[in-house]
From Swiss-Prot:
Native organism: Escherichia coli O157:H7
One annotated Gene Ontology cellular component of this protein: 3-isopropylmalate dehydratase complex
Record-annotated disulphide pairs: none
Name of the gene this protein is made from: leuD
The name this protein goes by in its record: 3-isopropylmalate dehydratase small subunit
SUPFAM superfamilies the record matches: LeuD/IlvD-like
Amino acid sequence: MAEKFIKHTGLVVPLDAANVDTDAIIPKQFLQKVTRTGFGAHLFNDWRFLDEKGQQPNPDFVLNFSQYQGASILLARENFGCGSSREHAPWALTDYGFKVVIAPSFADIFYGNSFNNQLLPVKLSDAEVDELFALVKANPGIHFDVDLEAQEVKAGEKTYRFTIDAFRRHCMMNGLDSIGLTLQHDDAIAAYEAKQPAFMR
């Protein structure tokens, strides 16, 4: 069973870029692993580092700024997660420590993959995201409160409403991924299998 997501309060980092694709999130040369761990070290590798080995941090990239170390909420622009359908993108984001991504829109496959990996993608309007960027840039180190149950983001003095479809919301709040959903029907599956002829078992 995955970790339950009900509420999260976290430090916000502003990635002021639109159309951030999955190759930027986790470059293809790091996709050889078959487990979900270890990808955070290579998140935004070509932007975070000046060298190919990932040993020389780029001082101009926002994730390297001291005030954003330990950030768990990523604020981004439209069409986040576009490009190829690699599930490694949400793996890298969660392994780095992100719990929430806020943007005006997401690529469809990335959006679905995020829920499967307990990464909450929050859609707000362009105007609301503009407000949040201004707020974060004026208050480096600010924390947002994200409440999935109430479907609200509290930022500064304002509250922003978002909508998640009921099924995905239920799964995240109960820590259910695809395997967890299947295991809810373990008894029924076992009963069905027991009725099968021996040659089919």
